[in-house]
Amino acid sequence: AFYICSKITKNNSNIRPHIIYSLPFTSVIDQNYEVLKEIVENNINKEISSEDLMKFHSVVPIEYENFEGYDARFCFENWQSKIISTTFVQLLNTIFKIGKNSIVNRFHRLANSVIILDEVQAIDDKYYKIISEFISIMARQYNCYIILVTATMPMLLDTIDLIEDKEKYFRKLNRINIINNSESEITLDEFEDIVLEDILENKDKSFLIVLNTVKSSKNIYKYLKENTDRDIIYLSTEIYPKLRLEKINKIKNRNKKYVVVSTQLIEAGVDIDMDIVYRDFSTLDSINQTAGRANRNGVGGKGIVKLYKIVDNDRRICNYIYPRYLLNATEEVLDGKYIIEEKDIYDCNKEYFLKVKNRLSNDTSDELLDLIPKLQFKKFRDKFELIENDEFRRVDIIVNADNITSSIIQQLENDNEIDNIDLKNKFRILRQYTVSVSRKEMSEI
């Protein structure tokens, strides 16, 4: 991205391109921000300020160096920094929801920019067509350079590969083996026994067990806690963001061999390195992302990824989460393959995405595209939701976990004269301590 920016400036000294680095989730941005900060400081040879690099998402307090109040809010919401680290939701809302609130004030910052979408496979495939159309327009009309980054690139977007003969590099990879045990189904109880036996036999190995639902992940976490003295860490969306980040940083300690039980949140951009990985059956791109947590750094022998198909009440748990056509495509690709070496994953991905492309429905994208010539922009904005809004089915709970939350809650309860910016910042901080639960779960608390 720095190289492309320098080329743009060299060709036209009047243009000062921005870099917009987007990731799927706020938690991933928070994990990667310090690394990004170090890279930027090394590139510009000085300590950075808000003018150089800014983190922008719903949990970040509104701050901008040398400015206060509404001036800080203006610089923050208008993306005045040279490098913006943000989420897919914020980036794509800036493109698709122009005309709404403060978004209109930052749309112009996209022109002449280098836009990076990291872990692009995390985007819902029903939006692939319209996103492809719009980023093509951004490239042609607004002089944007779009970089899509993923180890499992969907062949559903028209792109130019920056690496020639990329297959050659994939075929040299030899860090992991995927052991496919998904030809038959097993119960969660049977899966628990298999995992426990492996953990007891390999006390010098770290383990990652990834389940498809919070319920199944909590069940196996409880079972392992009761039956082994290993240090077990649990991760899911039921853990508030600040604590999740602390747990992930703890897992990164290579001097200790943890057992980690998690939902799929571990997949995209979470930089941990485990020896043995277990995965409940899912779509191939999701399996590959989980496999990326095994022997990530290529040290300590070959990593093992063990794939199982778990059932609950005679129904596959994966069917609760993933579209049937994606699971079918995965089953067809893996059929007859017991051991899949890392060098063979590229061909599996290629076959998988060809199958997906032939079965993918573009109805949602087509409906959105049809609204544009009709000038139905409000309906267009309202219909595009990268993350489905289920506020009527879920409730946010603030966990009063430490002195920070206690102090903020006390101020909100007692101070009626908090200015608007300060109020926004306090709620942004509280989002780091917020979990979302279903209304049914809420009634049981």
Could you tell me what each predicted segment is?
Residues A1-N14, V35:
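Walker A/P-loop NTP-binding motif
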Residues T94, V259-M274, Q289-N297:
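SF2 helicase motor core recognition
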Residues L53-F67, L211-K215, I232-I248, S262-E267:
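Conserved helicase motor
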Residues I15-E41, H57-V60, M155, V214:
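Conserved Walker A/P-loop ATP-binding site and its immediately adjacent core
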Residues Y145, V149-E201:
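Interdomain hinge/linker at the junction between the two RecA-like core domains of SF2 helicases
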Residues V89-N93, I103-M138:
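SF2 helicase catalytic motif II
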Residues N42-K97:
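Inter-Walker segment of RecA-like/P-loop motor cores
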Residues A139, D193-L200, D204, V210, ...:
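C-terminal helicase lobe and adjacent C-terminal extensions/tails of nucleic-acid helicase motors
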